[in-house]
């Protein structure tokens, strides 16, 4: 090999290495991404079973049913007629209650319309509404003035009196 061919081989090998690294990073991110949905979104476009998503909204009034052990079933609603039944096994945050803003993460069980959550997030203030949920309610025209009690913070911790008081429960 002459000098020109060696240089071409090194450049081609380097580009191949970079392409492989980019593909591996893209694959890793695609496996860990959980898209955010509200019940109205799921009514329009169902999600394939065993696809990991985040489901946000309000815990439906009168929907919390405690089962055997630490299993809890409740509905997540977005203020419209749409509601999604959620099943969670684990310890719920102390601040979890009906009418509270909640974000759950998990997937739909195959062959059912039940969302099986493995993470439940609830916020400290009864007037707090997660930013994603508040934005979606505004888009759908379901937002009521005074709901949420505050403007959605632009950055984590801004606009909250006690930003560290987020409750998280993970199985």
From Swiss-Prot:
General function of this protein: Heme chaperone required for the biogenesis of c-type cytochromes. Transiently binds heme delivered by CcmC and transfers the heme to apo-cytochromes in a process facilitated by CcmF and CcmH.
Pfam families for the chain: CcmE
Keyword Protease: no
Spans annotated as Disordered: 132-171
Keyword Nucleotide-binding appears in the UniProt entry: no
Family under the similarity heading: Belongs to the CcmE/CycJ family.
Annotated PANTHER family: CYTOCHROME C-TYPE BIOGENESIS PROTEIN CCME HOMOLOG, MITOCHONDRIAL
InterPro entries: CcmE, CcmE-like_sf, NA-bd_OB-fold
Cysteine-cysteine disulfides: none
Superkingdom, natural source: Bacteria
Periplasmic topology ranges: 29-171
Residue stretches spanning the membrane: 8-28
Protein name: Cytochrome c-type biogenesis protein CcmE
Molecular functions per Gene Ontology: heme binding; metal ion binding
HAMAP family: CcmE
Residues that bind heme: 124, 128
GO biological process: cytochrome complex assembly
Annotated keywords: Cell inner membrane, Cell membrane, Cytochrome c-type biogenesis, Heme, Iron, Membrane, Metal-binding, Signal-anchor, Transmembrane, Transmembrane helix
GO CC terms, sorted: plasma membrane
Compartments reported by the entry: Cell inner membrane
Encoding gene (name): ccmE
Cytoplasmic side: 1-7
Membrane topology: Single-pass type II membrane protein
Major site of localization recorded for this protein: membrane
């Amino acid at each position: 090999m002459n000098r020109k061919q060696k240089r071409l081989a090194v450049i081609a090998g380097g580009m191949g290495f970079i392409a492989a690294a980019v593909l591996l990073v893209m694959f890793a991110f695609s496996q860990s991404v959980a898209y955010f949905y509200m019940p109205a979104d799921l009514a329009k476009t169902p999600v394939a079973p065993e696809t990991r998503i985040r489901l946000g909204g309000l815990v439906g009034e009168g929907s919390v049913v405690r089962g055997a052990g630490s299993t809890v079933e409740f509905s997540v609603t977005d203020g419209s007629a749409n509601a999604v039944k959620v099943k969670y096994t684990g310890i719920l945050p102390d601040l979890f209650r009906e009418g509270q803003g909640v974000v759950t993460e998990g997937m739909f069980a195959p062959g059912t319309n039940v969302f099986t959550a493995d993470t439940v997030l609830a916020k400290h203030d009864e007037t707090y509404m997660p930013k994603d949920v508040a934005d979606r309610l505004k888009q759908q025209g379901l937002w009521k003035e005074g709901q949420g009690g505050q403007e959605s913070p632009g950055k984590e911790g801004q606009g909250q009196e006690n930003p560290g008081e987020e409750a998280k429960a993970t199985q």
